[in-house]
Amino acid sequence: ANAVGIAVGNAPYSPASVADYAIMMMLMVLRHIKPMLLRYAGQDYTAGYLGRELPNLTVGIVGLGRIGETVARHLQGFGCRILGWNRTPRADLSDLVEAVELDELLSRSDIVSLHLTACPETEHFIDVAAIEKMKDGAVLINTARGPLVNNSALIDALESGKLSGAGLDVFDGDRL
């Protein structure tokens, strides 16, 4: 494939482990787990961190390869709406996700979960323009590759309240 200019990628680890990790990050951000744990460490047990529940939300999965598909399959048990976008449409997943165009996914999703490879076409895939299309208060999850997200745009969106949270397993080369 490389000889004829076709890029080939493979993630040698279990799609299920990454999918579970992505969903765990969604739940942690939605339920404010880190601030809650910090309060508990200081022996502050007052209420105030109820958060949001997945059954009331729409999750948009960007990239429906093995990992993105597995995220969608695992999310089915949570009762949320699942939207999906893939560079190459996946008609075989029509029973699992509602296939939509990227702009629609960004505008309708309460959570956007990235599952793309890193290549020149996906560098800073989530930038100022993409974030502007996202729902106010949305959450961004990136367990794929750091360069998919423009760090400066993400920080600005979090500080302004445009995004309510982010779960990041990977970062672009710059420190956050």
Regions found by a protein language model. Name each.
Residues G9, L83, P147:
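Conserved beta-strand positions in the Rossmann-like core of class I SAM-dependent methyltransferases
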Residues L64-G65:
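Glycine-rich Rossmann-fold phosphate-binding loop(s) that bind the pyrophosphate
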Residues S17, R81-L83, A91:
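Structural/interface elements that position substrates and couple domains in central-metabolism enzymes
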Residues N10-T58, T70-G77:
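Phosphate-binding beta-alpha-beta segment of Rossmann-like dinucleotide-binding domains, i.e.
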Residues A1-V8, S14, S107, D127-A129:
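An N-terminal-biased, well-structured beta-alpha scaffold segment characteristic
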Residues R87-L176:
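Rossmann-like adenosine-cofactor binding region
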